[in-house]
A protein has these predicted regions:
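Membrane-embedded alpha-helical core segments of multi-pass
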Residues: 90-91, 159, 181-182
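Conserved anion/nucleotide-ligand pocket segment
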Residues: 164-203
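Membrane-helix boundary/helix-loop-helix interface segments in multi-pass membrane proteins
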Residues: 78-79, 151, 175
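Structural detector of well-ordered beta-strand residues that form the stable sheet scaffold
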Residues: 120-121, 142, 161, 174
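A conserved active-site-flanking secondary-structure segment within enzyme catalytic domains
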Residues: 136-167, 197, 201-206
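Extended, subdomain-level signal for the structured scaffold at the beginning of enzyme domains
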Residues: 1-120, 129-132, 191, 200, ...
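Flexible, glycine/proline-enriched loop segments at strand-loop-helix junctions
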Residues: 96-99, 136-139, 173-177, 188-189
Length: 240
């Protein structure tokens, strides 16, 4: 089904196309986490004798291999026609996000693709891509706690809340907090699409909460320090 998301998005009846945007320096878990949730959902649904599910494709400029920030290289397909309907467009974060959002052609593709997507989802600093494309003007969003102040400073029209694990920013846009929060959001989207039983089955398989208790400030506190014991400024310098 992966090819369906490129050559004919959503052509298989009942299958929801998921297109994940990759770029140099993307955070690997921001890509792989949601992909694992959506593909697991398809497996659960097949086990129930259902034909619906998700067709997941990772795409990049020119279909070039994606060098992630952790050194893993991901295979990718070329960017699909942005005018073709997509169910879910996923915008991951990573230390390469500034380079990606400074690419006017990529942002132009993103803006048009989002117009034809049922929903657009950002993970971690992928919120900067969404903001750069004007997808969250006047909306409340979240991002990785260490980058919330920077996002708010750069995009005055966006209200940034550093606490939630994810936010439904508008009727068509969702934003998730840092890194693993993309898994939480993907589970919520699956639950919204096909029900709690499927989402709960996936959560058990992944050995995680279906609904994580608390927000992300519990991981930043006290004094907004990162898990590595460094300040947000040092964190950004190291990982952004």
């Amino acid at each position: 089904h992966g090819l369906d998301a490129i050559t004919g998005v959503g052509e298989a009846e009942g299958v929801r196309s998921v297109v994940v945007l990759g770029y140099r320096g993307v955070q690997a878990l921001d890509v792989v986490g949601p992909c694992d949730v959506f593909t697991a959902a398809t497996g659960v649904l097949r086990g129930q004798g259902r034909e619906d599910g998700y067709a997941v494709s990772v795409v990049s400029r020119g279909g070039a291999p994606i060098a992630t920030g952790t050194g893993l290289e991901l295979a990718a397909r070329p960017l699909p026609d942005p005018r073709r309907p997509v169910d879910t467009l996923v915008l991951p974060g990573g230390f390469g996000v500034d380079e990606a959002r400074s690419d006017p052609e990529l942002i132009g593709w993103l803006r048009l693709a989002a117009e034809h997507a049922r929903r657009t989802v950002s993970v971690c600093t992928g919120a900067f891509l969404a903001a750069q494309a004007g997808l969250v003007d006047g909306c409340a969003v979240t991002t990785h706690w260490a980058f919330a102040d920077r996002l708010a400073a750069e995009f005055a029209s966006v209200t940034v809340d550093p606490n939630p694990i994810f936010v439904r920013s508008s009727d068509r846009v969702w934003t998730a907090a840092g890194v693993t929060a993309g898994i939480d959001l993907a589970l919520a989207l699956v639950e919204d699409d096909v029900g709690t039983d499927v989402a709960q089955t996936i959560a058990r398989w992944l050995v995680m909460y279906l609904r994580r208790p608390g927000g992300q400030t519990q991981f930043a506190a006290p004094q907004l320090r990162s898990p590595l014991g460094i300040s947000p400024g040092q964190y950004r310098k190291t990982f952004a």
